[in-house]
Swiss-Prot record:
It comes from Neisseria gonorrhoeae (strain ATCC 700825 / FA 1090). The lineage of its organism: Bacteria, Pseudomonadati, Pseudomonadota, Betaproteobacteria, Neisseriales. InterPro entries: FA_synthesis, Phospholipid_synth_PlsX-like. Its EC number is 2.3.1.274. Belongs to the PlsX family. Homodimer. Probably interacts with PlsY. This is Phosphate acyltransferase. It is found in: Cytoplasm. Keywords: Cytoplasm, Lipid biosynthesis, Lipid metabolism, Phospholipid biosynthesis, Phospholipid metabolism, Transferase.
């Protein structure tokens, strides 16, 4: 039985999204229990209204909620009994294999880092997410917004933890291909930080394939793509916006006249397949990667379907035990990276 901790009060709509999302998830997974943190009276009322299987739900009453615009410092100092903090505590105490929250990203990252700590050798956790491609291939992208200003060493650390996670989840595919997001593929391009990161990765034991432009990510050119949080977040939001724009443009075009409406009927199976593949809700659920525990961040503005998929991501990570397998690999890769760095410095 897998146990997940669910922060029920977080997100733009709170219980209106988390409870129906959790209910649908539980109905699809009889091997899961949930620890739902939040106001017990409100939670119990919402769960009963949703027809949730109460025999597989434990309610952990909390008295505080972290606001969506609350500072990380305030959340850490003043919200020790919040639904967010208590959910993460369940992972720390071994009562749950993973925690899921749609709450304030900065507060969640700060709280998770404070409670769970980072994997030895990793300075900062990163927000990582699996993105679709034009095939069945998926690509892990990080950092998607946690660290807007990074050193070359931190970017190299992101590459290490990303590579180790993908390898742990898909060992049959061999060493993951790691790409560094840049404005061109040539090693002379980019900022000084990116150029220095390129050299670090080039001398590492990772399967580094060089720079990758963002327009190649959805074509599966790499298994892991690395960027600082500023570039990564802009990249992610651009992809999400482009998908939304394209979906709307196709819909409007098919509704523009009678002929196109008739053509839409014939194309309906293909359109449904395309919509299903590009539905951003299916890829909701980002991993706070680099922590000594599994924490999944859902979009704050998601709906019940999107929140269910965030729970699916937590379930997948917990069941595969991928994060628990990577610490040794991370230590070995970081040691090799440091040795290569020292050799490079000595040769200068």
């Amino acid at each position: 039985m897998i146990t997940l901790a669910v922060e029920s009060m977080g997100g733009d709509q709170g219980l209106a999204v988390t409870v129906p999302g959790a209910t649908a998830f539980l109905q699809a997974h009889p091997d899961v229990r949930l620890i739902m943190t939040g106001d017990e009276t409100q939670l119990r009322q919402a769960l009963n209204a949703a027809g949730a299987p109460m025999e597989r739900i434990d309610i952990c009453h909390t008295t505080q909620v972290v606001g969506m615009d609350e500072s990380p410092q305030s959340a850490l100092k003043n919200k020790k009994y919040s639904s967010m903090r208590v959910a993460i505590n369940q992972v720390k105490e071994g009562k749950a294999q993973a925690a899921v929250s749609a709450g304030n990203t900065g507060a969640l990252m700060a709280t998770a880092r404070f409670v769970l700590k980072t994997i030895p050798g990793i300075e900062r956790p990163a927000i990582a997410k699996f993105l679709p491609s034009d095939t069945d291939h998926v690509t892990l992208a990080l950092d998607l917004g946690a660290n807007v200003d990074c050193t070359p060493e931190q970017l190299a650390q992101f590459a290490v933890i990303g590579s180790e996670l993908v390898h742990a989840l898909h060992p049959q595919k061999g060493q993951p291909r790691v790409g560094l997001v840049n404005v061109g593929t040539e090693d002379i391009k980019g900022t000084d930080t990116v150029k220095q990161t390129y050299k670090l990765l080039q001398n590492s034991k990772l399967n580094f394939i060089g720079n990758i432009e963002s327009n190649g990510i959805l074509y599966g050119e790499a298994d892991v793509v690395v960027a600082d949080g500023f570039v990564g977040n802009v990249m992610l939001k651009t992809i999400e916006g482009a998908v939304k724009f394209m979906s709307g443009a196709i819909r409007r075009e098919f509704q523009s006249n009678l002929f196109n409406k008739l053509a839409a009927v014939a194309a309906l199976p293909a359109l449904k397949g395309l919509k299903n593949k590009l539905d951003p809700r299916k890829f909701n659920g980002a991993i706070l990667l680099g922590l000594r525990g599994i924490v999944i961040k859902s979009h704050g503005g998601t709906d019940k379907t999107g929140f269910r998929y965030a729970l699916e991501e937590a379930y997948h990570e917990a069941k595969s035990a991928g994060l628990s397998k990577i610490e040794q690999g991370v230590a070995e890769q970081l040691a090799a990276l440091e040795a290569a760095q020292n050799e490079t410095a000595a040769s200068l």
